[in-house]
Amino acid sequence: MILPLFPETQVHVFVYENVSNCAAIHEQLISQNPIYDYAFLDAATILYKKQVYSAIIRALEDRRDEQMKTKTIHSEVILSLSPKTEISSAFRQFSMTKKSKNIVVVKIDSKLTEEEEFERLDKLVEGNRVEFSDEELQKLIDFKVLKKNYKLDPSTLENPLASILSSIALRGYS
């Protein structure tokens, strides 16, 4: 996919459910294996496609403006999801863990087509790929975790998208 604000940047997003090898993937991420150069997100923390796209755009804007706080564009996506400025907190709240069961995988600056990228990921992730859609994400969400991560109160739970997007956009500006 090409984002209108960044036409030179290829972006792919995939969703997997019932992933059985998150612990092995996590170990590869810790060892910085370049084959795993993706943003691996815990799907329990993602409610909307716009949430992911907003984090991607925020990360790309920070890279363009030379304002990245992390070492890679993929870790910047994870930080961009967070309403907090602490990198370690963002990773604890939004990154895939050893115990994750469902994940969202983001690839930025891919030289491969979406299908080629999927084939590559299919060798790394042992799980079922599902459509990247609000409907599928909402099946995988953990509202307790979402409320905690974004400090959502009962008044915002009816339509949390505005609060989530505001948190992403305003991180570091308060």
Swiss-Prot record:
Protein's cellular compartments: Nucleus; Chromosome, Telomere
InterPro entries the UniProt entry points to: CGI121/TPRKB, CGI121/TPRKB_sf
Keyword Transmembrane helix: no
Keywords of this entry: Activator, Chromosome, Nucleus, Telomere, Transcription, Transcription regulation, tRNA processing
GO biological process, one term: tRNA threonylcarbamoyladenosine modification
GO cellular component annotations of the record: chromosome, telomeric region; cytosol; EKC/KEOPS complex; nucleus
Keyword tRNA processing part of the UniProt annotation: yes
Domain of life of the source: Eukaryota
Gene3D superfamilies: CGI121/TPRKB (3.30.2380.10)
Function: Component of the EKC/KEOPS complex that is required for the formation of a threonylcarbamoyl group on adenosine at position 37 (t(6)A37) in tRNAs that read codons beginning with adenine. The complex is probably involved in the transfer of the threonylcarbamoyl moiety of threonylcarbamoyl-AMP (TC-AMP) to the N6 group of A37. Cgi121 acts as an allosteric effector that regulates the t(6)A activity of the complex. The EKC/KEOPS complex also promotes both telomere uncapping and telomere elongation. The complex is required for efficient recruitment of transcriptional coactivators.
Family according to the record: Belongs to the CGI121/TPRKB family.
Subunit structure: Component of the EKC/KEOPS complex composed of at least of SPAP27G11.07c/BUD32, cgi121, gon7, pgp2 and SPAC4H3.13/PCC1; the whole complex dimerizes.
Name the UniProt record assigns to this protein: EKC/KEOPS complex subunit cgi121
The organism of origin for this protein: Schizosaccharomyces pombe (strain 972 / ATCC 24843)
Lineage: Eukaryota, Fungi, Dikarya, Ascomycota, Taphrinomycotina
Gene behind the chain: cgi121
